[in-house]
Amino acid sequence: MNSIRKLYCRAFQLVFRIALPFLPYREPKLLEGVQGVAELLARKNVNQVLLVTDKGIRSHGLTRPLEDALAKAGIGVSIFDDTVANPTVANVEAARRLYLDAGCRAIIAFGGGSSMDCAKACGARIARPNKPLAKMEGLLHVMRPLPLLIAVPTTAGTGSETTLAAVITDGESHHKYPINDFALIPPYALLDPEVTVGLPPQLTATTGMDAMTHAVEAYIGGSTTRGTRQAAVEAVRLILESLPVAYASGGDRTARAHMLRAAYLAGTAFTKSYVGYVHAVAHSLGGQYGIAHGLANAVLLPEVLEAYGPAAHKRLGRLAVEVGVASVNDTPAQASAKFIAKLRKMNADMGIPRTLEGIREEDLPALARHADHEGNPLYPVPVLMDANELQALYRLVMPKTEENTNDAAADRTGGAKAETILLDRQNTAAGVSHQSA
C-alpha cells in the first residue's frame, strides 16, 4: 500500500477511535427464557411477529418452545425459514414481504449468524423501504430505527446478538455487502444453552473459532480500548477452556453456556474495536464459493496472525500471557508464536483443516479487491495491505499444488503478489505500520 493511502487509513481510524466514546453503542438486554420473550412482546403490545430462522433449525424442533410460548400469550407467528448459509438479497426481500403481508410488528432472529444477518437486514429494509441493500453497504447508511428486534442465537460464534453488523450476499454477483449501523444492534437477546446442545461437533468447532477470531482481532487492532480488551480476554479464556469440552461432549450445558457467553463478549469487543483482514478475506471466500464463515475464519486466523509478523507481536503476546498460553518471561515474539501454535493445535484437535478447498488462482485479484474494499480504511489492522498484497493471504490457505507452488517460488524471486510481500512487510512493519499499545 502506498504511503498516501496508508496515511489516509490511519487518519480515518484515529478519528473513529477518538469518536468512539461518543457513539451510540448499546448492549442488548438479556431475557430469561422463552417466556421472557413472550412477556416482552405482550408488554410492547405486539400481536404478530416475524420469526426468521432456517429449515435445519425448524426441522430439529428448536423453535417449538418459543412458538408455544408465543401462542400461549396470544401472539401470532409468521415464520420465514428459507435463510441460506450466506443470506442473500433475495432472502431478505422475501422475509420483508412476509413481514408486511402478515402485519408483523416485531422480528425474532432465531439461529446462527445467517439468520441474525437476514433478520437485521430485513429490519433495515423495513426501516428504509426505498433504499436497496447495496446502498446500505458500509458504515452508517441505515440511520433509522428498526422494528423491535430480538436475537436468539443457536450457535456460540457470531456474537451477532450484540453487533451492529450484517453481511448479505448478492446472489448474482456473489458480492458481499457488509452493513454496519448502530440501528442493527438488537435491543434484546436470549442466551439459552438448550438450543445449542444439539449443535454438531464440527459446527460447534467452527463457530467457536469464529468467536475466537472476533476476540483476537478486536484485541490486536488499533482501536482497542480497556473495555474491549477486557471483554476479548474473558472471551478467549472461556473459549480455550470450554470449546474443547463442547466439541467433545455436546450435552455439557456448562460448556455450552460458557461458549454463548464467550461469543457475546467477543461480539461486544469487536462491535467497538472492529475486526481485521481475517474477516475481510473470509467474507470474500463466502461470497464467491459459499465457504462457511466460521470455517474460513478458523483456517485463516493463525495464518494471518503469523503473516502480520512483528507489528502484532506486542499485543498478541500480551493476550497470550493474559489467557495463560504464554509466560511473562517470554518475549512478545515467543508469546505470539505460542498463541498461534495453540490455535493450530485446537484446529487440528477438532478436525479443522489447514487449507480451504476450491480457491482458484484466477479469482485472487477479484477476491482481494473485495477484501481491500471491505477492510480499508475501516479495519484498524496491525499491518495495512492493499489488494495486491492481500492476495498473499489467500495463497496461505490454498492447498499446495505444483502451479501455486511455482507461483510462490516466482514471488520469492522478485514477484510482488504473495508470500514475499508478507516477509518484506514483517521486516519493515515495526518501523512503518506498528500500532503502539
Protein language model annotation of sequence segments:
Residues 48-54, 78-81, 107-110, 150, ...:
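Short glycine-rich or small-residue beta-strand-to-loop segments that form or flank ligand, phosphate
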Residues 2-7, 316, 326-437:
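C-terminal charged capping/lid subdomain of soluble metabolic enzymes
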Residues 273-338, 344:
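C-terminal catalytic subdomain
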Residues 90-194:
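Glycine/threonine-rich beta-strand-loop-alpha-helix active-site module
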Residues 58-130, 245-256:
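N-terminal small/polar loop signature for handling phosphorylated ligands or for N-terminal nucleophile
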